[in-house]
Design a protein with these regions (language model features):
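Conserved alpha-helical scaffold segments that buttress catalytic/binding sites
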Residues: 2-341
Length: 341
């Protein structure tokens, strides 16, 4: 049965590699605590009572990717990313006290693994994910979600919208692909944003770094006809005299609130993912964007990464890459070291 596993301190401790003279982030993060709540239930007040500002959770699944005829493997990113994050040094730059590690979704394989069966299962995943996101946002916290496929953008956007009083979300997606495929195909990782738009939860949608080689003939016309959808093509970035961060800041200048940030790891060169690319952003480009951010994003979703793919490819550094993105996102809105008492 599909469910959400809430982590205890014991779950966290099992992932920490202790070393004399060092303190790890995992020794300072918070876990969910509600002794009076029924087992497995997440209470909004209990989330509000936590001193942590950020709530970390995982969606280790690749059903949405497979439903889009992609290569399985994105379910492997969460554990690797979490272990990498928990073993970062706790210090004055980031202590770990800022983070509540909530847990991860446990999603069973569908009995019917046909394309239709997989797409039906994605609908089930949507219904499982959005209420948890809704509670986190309702509690005034910022969810950091590690996927999983980009199909999960739809329930994350829905949950964030409902949790913020029903306000439509405005989202910028760093991605080589638009994920605006036809909803009539059935749910999969290629139509997360068209689903969010069609469901009324998404207002502005901006794609940064979209690759011209991976869009169908009708997409440019579709974008041009919709004033709320904007794309900055990666090929235009390559020809621009401005830096990536300058183009980014100009591109998101009119992004309204509440807003969400999506990072598809297939936009970054040589990161193992469902659609790994040889041409894309450098990891430090994305780190620069995150560390220079001063916008209060309502959520961060990092998706499509993997440590092991069904075709046999492996990369043990993916978890560390994701951990960098998580910590950069948090550090950006912390007081600079020079401003701390």
């Amino acid at each position: 049965m599909d469910s959400f596993k809430i982590y205890t301190q014991s779950d966290i401790d099992l992932l920490i590699s202790e070393r004399v003279g060092e303190e790890k982030l995992g020794q300072h993060v918070h876990v969910y605590d509600c002794p009076t709540c029924p087992e497995g239930e997440i209470d909004i007040q209990a989330l509000m009572d936590s001193p942590a500002r950020y709530v970390l959770l995982g969606i280790p699944e690749d059903i949405g990717v497979r439903a889009n005829l992609g290569i399985a493997g994105t379910k492997t990113a969460w554990n690797s990313a979490l272990k990498a994050l928990l073993n970062i040094q706790s210090n004055l730059f980031l202590s770990g006290e800022e983070i509540l590690v909530l847990g991860h979704f446990e999603i069973e394989e569908p009995i019917d693994t046909s394309l239709q069966g997989l797409r039906k299962k994605v609908n089930t995943i949507d219904a499982l994910v959005y209420p948890i996101i809704q509670k986190i946002v309702n509690a005034g916290k910022i969810p950091i979600v590690i996927g999983g496929g980009h199909n999960n953008a739809a329930p994350i956007i829905a949950g964030a919208s409902l949790g913020s009083g029903g306000h439509k979300m405005n989202v910028v997606n760093i991605d080589a692909h638009a994920d605006l495929r036809d909803r009539a195909e059935g749910r999969h990782s290629g139509n997360g944003f068209s689903t969010a738009l069609g469901s009324g939860y998404l207002n502005q949608y901006k794609i940064f770094g979209l690759h011209q080689n991976y869009i169908n003939q009708s997409l440019p016309d579709y974008i041009a006809a919709n004033q709320n959808i904007k794309a900055f093509y990666f090929e235009d970035l390559l020809q621009s005299p401005k830096s990536v961060i300058e183009n980014w800041n100009e591109f998101i200048a009119d992004l309204q609130e509440p807003s969400g940030l999506e990072i598809d790891l297939d936009s970054i060169e040589k990161v193992l993912s469902s659609a790994q690319t040889s041409s894309g952003f450098q990891l430090n480009d994305i780190r620069n964007i995150l560390l220079c951010n001063r916008r209060n994003f309502a959520y961060l979703h990092v998706c499509e990464g993997a440590t092991e793919m069904a075709d046999g490819k492996t990369d043990s550094t993916t978890g560390k890459t994701i951990a960098y993105l998580i910590t950069d996102f948090i550090k950006a809105l912390q007081p600079h070291i020079s401003q701390k008492p």
